[in-house]
Amino acid sequence: MAYSYTEKKRIRKDFGKLPQVMDVPYLLAIQLDSYFDFLQQDRAIEERLDVGLHAAFKSVFPIESFSGNAALEYVSYRFGTPAFDVKECQLRGVTYSAPLRVKVRLIIYDKDSSTKAIKDIKEQEVYMGEIPLMTENGTFVVNGTERVIVSQLHRSPGVFFDHDKGKSHSSGKLLYSARIIPYRGSWLDFEFDPKDNVYVRIDRRRKLPATVLLRALGMSAEEILETFFDTSTFHIEKSGFSVELVPSRLRGETATFDIKDGEGNLIVEEGRRITQKHIRQMEKAGLERLDVPMEYLFGKTLAKDQVDPNTGELVCECNTEITPELLEKIGQAGITTLETLYTNDLDTGPFVSDTLKIDTTHSQLEALVEIYRMMRPGEPPTKEAAETLFHNLFFTEDRYDLSGVGRMKFNRRLRREGDTGSGVLDNQDILDVMRELINIRNGFGEVDDIDHLGNRRIRCVGEMAENQFRVGLVRVERAVKERLSMAESEGLMPQDLINAKPVAAAVKEFFGSSQLSQFMDQNNPLSEVTHKRRVSALGPGGLTRERAGFEVRDVHATHYGRLCPIETLEGPNIGLINSLATYSHTNSYGFLETPYRKVVDRQVTDEVVHLSAIEEGDFIIAQASATVDESNKLTDDLVQVRHKGETTFMAPDKVTLMDVSPRQVVSVAAALIPFLEHDDANRALMGSNMQRQAVPTLKAEKPLVGTGMERFVARDSGVCAVARRGGVIDSVDAKRIVVRINEDEIIGGEAGVDIYNLTKYVRSNQNTCMNQRPIVRPGDVVARGDILADGPSVDMGDLALGQNMRMAFMPWNGYNFEDSILISERVVEEDRFTSIHIQELTCVSRDTKLGAEEISSDIPNVGEAALGKLDDAGIVYIGAEVGAGDILVGKVTPKGETQLTPEEKLLRAIFGEKASDVKDTSLRAPTGMKGTVIDVQVFTRDGVEKDSRALSIEQSQLDEVRKDLQETYRIAEEATFERLKRALIGQPVNGGPKLKKGDTLDEAYLDELPRSQWFKLRMQDESLNELLAQADEQLENRRKEMDERFEDKKRKLTQGDDLAPGVLKIVKVYLAVKRRIQSGDKMAGRHGNKGVISSIMPIEDMPFDDNGEPVDVVLNPLGVPSRMNVGQILETHLGMAANGLGVKIDRMLRDARQQQVAEIRDFLGQVYNTAETRQEDIDSLSDDEIITLAKNLRSGVPVATPVFDGAKEHEIKHLLTLADLPDSGQMTLYDGRTGDAFDRQVTVGYMYMLKLNHLVDDKMHARSTGSYSLVTQQPLGGKAQFGGQRFGEMEVWALEAYGAAYTLQEMLTVKSDDVEGRTKMYKNIVDGDHSMQAGMPESFNVLVKEIRSLGIDIELEG
């Protein structure tokens, strides 16, 4: 087994029993693939698929002028290079985007020609705005901040049949409906009312009888009836009436007369129900016609118009009910055959016939006018307008599009052949939908389940961006059409016709302010990954949380392997915002697919198929944990399977598919919870959500008990530096890693060096600190995909959100009441949960009406001490320690001219006029903040002179760039000469400095030869001469490239910044704040066990064991039983064993080296290779690697217990025994204060604890004086507004109950909204007089005004 660089250093013991059939896929693929398809940037123009931008252009172009004499065609598009890279965009606060240039062709036709001959063709590239680019980690940088576009789960286009569940009508009758939902265009609904008439609605407007729509399609009443009904044929003869018999139609009816066969034998007696047996007798007797009494025809409905055969006169219309009078009339007219509609109450209702009777329209025109009136009430209809409107609704591609997925769903639901077809509707589509609806009402067929994932699809970022782009293009199209008519006469070029602003505005609006474009959650790597894999049912075209019912939010059987049943938000959005399951991805139609292994005749194969919820229904699917023998055959007599949404047991030979992995059910965050199978789902939900809120600690520590998913999240999150190609580490420092590439991975003409510049102390969106630390050393060999540097919350390539803490589950003096957590002082001393938070503070200098604001250290009325940390430019030094109220950037603002007294005038005349006409508006550190300045950025408007600080920052950045480029060149040069040296040594030469023909080159000569002279060597081997020439050219090109890059960077740095109007200068100060853990901070485990720290106890007071080892954290045992998250107990036991093994290895490491290696190798074999678990190849490691591994295991042997395939109880006990610990997992603890043993043994072990981003420093806040509400004059609320604590109604009752009248008066007046009283009080306090005089609260005045506004006069007396 080959181990990666990091795996070799610290192997995680895996308790998984099931084989790893399929690796965890790339977790961000859903974002990157979707946006790649949208841009198709790297695809050749001729290979571009009909999706994304290409499809948007093709759907809008060609644009023809109104006259048809000119047209604008789309040819192709390309992207320019972005003006700034990602880091520069974040720094400058601009969007990371590339210019889109579209090649269009203007064709002008000859007006006079009858064949539309082409008169002129002009082709030109047109700029169509900036398109935001996705970073390699699946995010967008919009206005300097990283954002994520969340995928949307919406109703798939197609046709859906449903009923109202009996809620609409008091009788509880089910009213069936059908809805055709297009991707773009008007919705079409058919619905039954309680009287069983069929109605149609367009875009949920007023309903019309459905036959109005059919008439508008050009159908007559006869055609409508013929389409929806079978007919019965009656013959009128002199002897009486007879009907052409279809025996099966009589089944279930009651005979109203005797039915006899041809020989007069009685088959069915009058009054008897006709059964299947009777029908067989009729068929046997060969009855074709049946004589019926006249009364049998009464009440039947005519299927055709009845015309007098002699005169051609209409006797009666179709859909007329037969009465004795009508029958007589028909008889007189000499009509011999009648066709009536076949209906019955059981399974062939007269719905369309009844609807026709209430339909007031009689012709196509009337129907079109009726539809026009419904769509455009109040507008006078004309024939043309009505026809155009109706045609545009469903039958033109510009206004209506079912899309490929909609047509596929439509055809499959109506059981048609083929999945493709037109994007617009036709008559047959509408008739088929009505027919299916009527069949469902008649009891044939089922309604659809809208929550089935076969009826909901994912709209990813690329698709949403395409739709938005198309919206912009359609706006452009209107303007272009108007200008095209002038194109010929004025000789315009394509550039003059197209205004790109609407497109740019539409795209900008989507990325900047769409509900689904969200500020990225960047607390830790997991929160980034989860945010990108999130699926929301909210957003444009989706649900609203107010309207979403319980069914939409609930877990559905089809979520299995597609959406996580556990991870969703708590609160009003529960169930509406979900997370993708681990192995889930979307197919070309946008439906979620999950992988399965094929099973053939009990044999489980390694062939993997990906199925959507629609395709999965017909298969019988076993779980991944189904028992198989050595040859991968299912062994059980009955296997637990899923089939059509139900879980059941079946014989193994019926099984067709099997799950790929037990973790395929859950999302990434839930798959990180060990022993998830032992936790209640509600607590697991909290656990997976709280992992996303964990703050990266100063030193990340891998979890002792993990699930094996940790390295996949770290790998795909993008926070680590990952080797792009394999090679040897050349040099490493804190900021840069240089890798010399393997020969076989070098692409021709390259230097063979990869340089990784690391992220150092950068602020994340959540103000946490992003920092990368190298984990490689010079000389290490790395392969492609190996982790070179850990990011925040990553430890040696493993996700590490928290710290392993020594736990005890016991009550301790009430300090762990109600989920409170008691921790030891040692945790604070060792900085286990210390985190760094970076605050960005901004000072903006504007151009005001009274003059420009100035950033300077010359600030009026401020002492020297306050200016001590500022430089000459008035900006704080890097490294300065600042506290609340300290000046960070000195700024003065011009003040309005005030009337001066003669004395002031005299002073101004003597001392100059600077001091009094400016006021101090400096940027100060906010209250409650204390930290160190780690960076300062100065942005200056183009044309404004840069200050000394801006120039020094610019110079230091240029020096950094120069150093970087020189280093790159040096390494490239060395690598090139190293390659040349290897090729040249021992080779004969034709000539060269101090060489004769035939000499062979040796190492000593080459070492002495100046490098500039190497290229003068002439070798006998011509290929070596080519190699030398090639190397010389490459180095020259590289030198030029470096110069160009430096000049480019210099130009970017020295040019002015593009700032908002009126802004002259922006100074950004970055403060690093160190937050130690303290009382009031929120902590949690991974099982939903959260709590607030109640107290931090001295180490000596904490409970300790027989070895004198104190515990770090004391948790309340009552937090476990009612919450049903037993996983935390199992984690604690297994963590104890893992730590115990580490202690044992530590003891071994202290022995002599020789015995040590053998003993450690043997012990590691015992630890890793137990009978049932996955085997690790310890023998493949060298002695040095074994020692390195053992050293890394000192703090504990990390274990993986995959979800639903984790460690069993006996395995945990085995490890505890191996670590020489009691297998009960409990031990005697002693009270640290008294030294007495506690009454009973206590569960002690190691649990992984997280510090959540709910820190008491961010919440704690106290107001002295501050701003007041405008109307009520009461203090504002909340920390952001520097508000007060609300003294509400109930608090008033409390003071009333205590009888504390004066305290209550103070609260309601001077401390709240008595304006005069509080001003007076302030003055009194300043003067040292602590008395108060309460006045009238302002809110009382507001109340009086409110009452007066209602017309009630209210006055105050006295």
UniProtKB/Swiss-Prot annotation:
Top-tier EC class: transferase
Any GO BP: DNA-templated transcription
Subunit structure: The RNAP catalytic core consists of 2 alpha, 1 beta, 1 beta' and 1 omega subunit. When a sigma factor is associated with the core the holoenzyme is formed, which can initiate transcription.
PANTHER family per the UniProt record, alphabetical: DNA-DIRECTED RNA POLYMERASE I SUBUNIT 2 (PTHR20856)
Organism of this sequence: Chromohalobacter salexigens (strain ATCC BAA-138 / DSM 3043 / CIP 106854 / NCIMB 13768 / 1H11)
One Gene Ontology cellular component: DNA-directed RNA polymerase complex
Reaction it catalyzes: RNA(n) + a ribonucleoside 5'-triphosphate = RNA(n+1) + diphosphate
GO MF: DNA binding; DNA-directed RNA polymerase activity; ribonucleoside binding
Taxonomic superkingdom: Bacteria
Pfam family, one: RNA_pol_Rpb2_7
Record function comment: DNA-dependent RNA polymerase catalyzes the transcription of DNA into RNA using the four ribonucleoside triphosphates as substrates.
Annotated family: Belongs to the RNA polymerase beta chain family.
Gene: rpoB
HAMAP family, alphabetized: RNApol_bact_RpoB (MF_01321)
Keyword annotations of the record: DNA-directed RNA polymerase, Nucleotidyltransferase, Transcription, Transferase
EC number: 2.7.7.6
The protein's name in its UniProt record: DNA-directed RNA polymerase subunit beta
